[in-house]
Amino acid sequence: MKKGINRVVLVGTGAVGCSYAYSMINQGVAEEFVLVDVNEAKAEGEAMDLSHAVPFSPSPTKVWSGSYADCKDADLVVITAGLPQKPGETRLDLVEKNTKIFKQIVRGIMDSGFDGIFLIATNPVDILTYVTWKESGLPKERVIGSGTTLDSARFRYMLGDYLDVDPRNVHAYIVGEHGDTELPVWSHATIGVQKLETILANNEQYKQEDLDKIFENVRDAAYQVIERKGATYYGIGMSLLRVTKAILNNENSVLTVSAYLEGQYGEKDAYVGVPAVINREGVREIVELELNEDEKAKFAHSVKVLKETMAPVL
């Protein structure tokens, strides 16, 4: 890392990577931003285009297309490269294809002398974050996946819409796999300072079956978007930006990232979406929510599915 200069390297300039890159320039988060892609011309073109937006950014950012060698002085490497999810394909269906790609990418990055933090977004994100941790040899705290940050954002947006409340005042989490086995933590959902269950008990117009439908829409949101426009990228781009800001600004923010469990929630040796405190060192600590029995069972099932899917590719 270069003292006093925040450098972020993005590996993968597809739709997700470029949405993240645009968000980064739009908010002026890093002083140096490097784009790397197997398609060098694409990375170069994106860097040129982004550079032309810098005069409108809140703060200047030096943007260029580079190579894995640029990772040597990076504080953060964000990986969005990999094969995208096709219509009808689950995130877990991608595991074998993207694991092979990822191992090559991580080795190339580590050969540069990189000693910063990894942030992974490629699906299946929990498994590929684990693969990155194993391949890199970095401390578990410095390998993070986007986890259920986007799912939690979708959850808060839809709950806010249903209750007619600013989603920024909705405090609710989706945990587990970023995918079909994820689960809502209803027992800890609050609107402002009031428990969601209290609001339901005191207002006849709000019903649990409506909330259950909201969760189904959260869980299946990616499928719905992919069916209509081919891919999701704005939401995950902003999610990655949020985690990036928490890291570079040493915020100690609580975000539902994919973090390594070693006994928390009764699970170990798995990366999975849970609330965690994020700062300049990566994951400072995991926030262990007291789940009810139903939530515990669903969380255990989610981790079990991840481990079973991951086993053949490790």
Swiss-Prot record:
InterPro entries documented for this protein: L-lactate/malate_DH (IPR001557), L-lactate_DH (IPR011304), L-lactate_DH_AS (IPR018177), Lactate/malate_DH_C (IPR022383), Lactate/malate_DH_N (IPR001236), Lactate_DH/Glyco_Ohase_4_C (IPR015955), NAD(P)-bd_dom_sf (IPR036291)
Coiled-coil intervals, chain numbering: none
Broadest EC class assigned to this enzyme: oxidoreductase
Pfam families given in the database record: Ldh_1_C (PF02866), Ldh_1_N (PF00056)
Gene Ontology process terms (BP): glycolytic process; lactate metabolic process; pyruvate metabolic process
Binding positions (substrate): Q85, R91, N123, P124, V125, D126, D151, S152, A153, R154, T232
Pathway terms, separated by semicolons: Fermentation; pyruvate fermentation to lactate; (S)-lactate from pyruvate: step 1/1
Active site: H178
Keyword NAD: yes
Residues carrying Phosphotyrosine: Y223
Its EC number(s): 1.1.1.27
HAMAP family hit by this protein: Lactate_dehydrog
Name this protein carries in UniProt: L-lactate dehydrogenase 2
